[in-house]
């Protein structure tokens, strides 16, 4: 099957499946999710074998440590994916929820009810877990999904899609509800970007290059999941022990993800007392530090930070550090270089915290906590399909509610308009 025919055929199947999914009951959708979870565990050996092929190819291509980490599947990650599907099954079904109802003077009753978006296209890079998370969320919310993963995870995505789609269909979901574009040909992406006849929305997940390509070239509506150039600002009135714990977690707990911190801003009043011990702890964890001139005066072994560093999402054990002279300077830096993803302040001053919350324009703004919590699971949404950095139609971690739209339902008793 050539690429154009594959996109057309799977698009038609998805459109047909979406009509059935929209009316599929909650219990039937949950049964399918639980069947998918069981299938992942039962087919673990085949999934890991497919992933091993991708890992070998990735190492031969010289993929970075961060990319290889995102690509890797192991028993724990498969268990986590299965657990995520079970958690999703336990969540309330947003579809059919009447969010408001009112009566007009003429007696008309008007309600606003949640409904699926329809067919969702997901274009993503080397993260096989996205295959399962996206499929599960779309099924939960009555949406059909067409997946197009990165070539680095080709075999993993094939194996995962085969396992979960068969399980979902056997449990009562329509055929075509979960489909993967099974080619590494980049033309498939170009075709999906213009597949208005089949797709209701496209969601890209990946690096800046992929997201920019989708946003600039798609004729299908796009929900932009942005790059995470995230900051932590350590205020003059911060608890420095707390600040060190937060910084180390935000940078090193999992550096290859979009909610990891990339730049640390430190108020000049605490820089001399805070940075030496922090730098030693970061060095012990293998972090490369790139600092401004004032940072390097305190941490002599730090590399020189350039203008490019302030704007870079490293996705690696690299941290840029800048000493600032005020909250205003920190806010200005975040405004200039931030990507409206996740930003944090560490402070004991309530008014300073309130000002930071009010003035930082980001999907998630933290006081005294790590940026690593910007995540659908951590927010209690179950799985997430991505973290939106735009303001329409969704913002922040996109859980089930964010994969619905609404329609109005109107009950009358013979009213006609005069």
Curated annotation (Swiss-Prot):
Pfam families (alphabetical): Aldedh
Catalysed reactions, semicolon-separated: L-glutamate 5-semialdehyde + phosphate + NADP(+) = L-glutamyl 5-phosphate + NADPH + H(+)
Name of the protein in question: Gamma-glutamyl phosphate reductase
Database matches in Gene3D superfamilies: Aldehyde Dehydrogenase, Chain A, domain 1, Aldehyde Dehydrogenase, Chain A, domain 2
GO molecular function annotations of the record: glutamate-5-semialdehyde dehydrogenase activity; NADP binding
Signal peptide: none
Function description: Catalyzes the NADPH-dependent reduction of L-glutamate 5-phosphate into L-glutamate 5-semialdehyde and phosphate. The product spontaneously undergoes cyclization to form 1-pyrroline-5-carboxylate.
EC number: 1.2.1.41
Localization in the cell: Cytoplasm
GO terms classed as biological process: L-proline biosynthetic process
Pathway of action: Amino-acid biosynthesis; L-proline biosynthesis; L-glutamate 5-semialdehyde from L-glutamate: step 2/2
Chief localization: cytoplasm
Enzyme class: oxidoreductase
PANTHER family: DELTA-1-PYRROLINE-5-CARBOXYLATE SYNTHASE, GLUTAMATE SEMIALDEHYDE DEHYDROGENASE
Protein family according to the UniProt entry: Belongs to the gamma-glutamyl phosphate reductase family.
GO cellular component, one term: cytoplasm
Keywords of this entry: Amino-acid biosynthesis, Cytoplasm, NADP, Oxidoreductase, Proline biosynthesis
């Amino acid at each position: 099957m050539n690429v154009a025919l594959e996109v057309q055929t799977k698009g038609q199947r998805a459109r047909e499946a979406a009509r059935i999914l929209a009316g599929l009951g909650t219990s039937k959708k949950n049964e399918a999710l639980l069947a998918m979870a069981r299938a992942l565990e039962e087919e673990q050996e085949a999934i890991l074998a497919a992933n091993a092929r991708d890992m070998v190819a990735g190492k031969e291509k010289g993929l970075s440590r961060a990319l290889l980490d995102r690509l890797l599947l192991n028993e724990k990650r498969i268990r986590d994916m299965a657990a995520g599907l079970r958690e999703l099954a336990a969540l309330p079904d947003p579809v059919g929820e009447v969010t408001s109802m009112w009566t007009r003077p003429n007696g008309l009753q008007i309600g606003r009810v949640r409904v699926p978006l329809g067919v969702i296209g997901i274009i993503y890079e080397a993260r096989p877990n996205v295959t399962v998370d996206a499929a599960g969320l779309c099924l939960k919310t009555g949406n059909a999904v067409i997946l197009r993963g990165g070539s680095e995870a080709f075999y993993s995505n094939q194996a995962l899609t085969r396992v979960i789609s068969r399980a979902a269909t056997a449990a009562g979901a329509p055929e075509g509800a979960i489909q993967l574009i099974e080619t590494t040909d980049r033309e498939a992406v170009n075709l999906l970007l213009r597949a208005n006849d089949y797709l209701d929305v496209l969601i890209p997940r990946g690096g800046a290059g992929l997201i920019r390509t989708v946003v600039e070239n798609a004729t299908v509506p796009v929900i932009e999941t942005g790059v995470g150039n995230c900051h932590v600002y350590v205020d003059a009135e911060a608890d420095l022990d707390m600040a060190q714990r937060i910084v180390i977690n935000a940078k090193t707990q999992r550096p290859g993800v979009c909610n990891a911190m990339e730049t640390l801003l430190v108020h000049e009043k605490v820089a001399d007392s805070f940075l030496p011990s922090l730098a030693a702890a970061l060095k012990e964890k293998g972090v490369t530090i790139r600092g401004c001139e004032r940072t390097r005066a305190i941490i002599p072994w730090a590399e020189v930070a350039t203008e490019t560093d302030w704007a870079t999402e490293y996705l690696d054990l690299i941290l840029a550090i800048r000493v600032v002279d005020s909250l205003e300077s920190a806010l200005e830096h975040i405004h200039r270089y931030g990507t409206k993803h996740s930003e944090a302040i560490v402070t004991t001053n309530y008014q300073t915290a309130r000002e930071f919350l009010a003035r930082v324009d980001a999907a998630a703004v933290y006081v005294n906590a790590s940026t690593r919590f910007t995540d659908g699971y951590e927010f209690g949404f179950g799985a997430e399909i991505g973290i939106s950095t735009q303001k329409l139609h969704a913002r922040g971690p996109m859980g089930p509610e964010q994969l619905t739209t609404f329609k109005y339902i109107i009950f009358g008793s013979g009213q006609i308009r005069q």
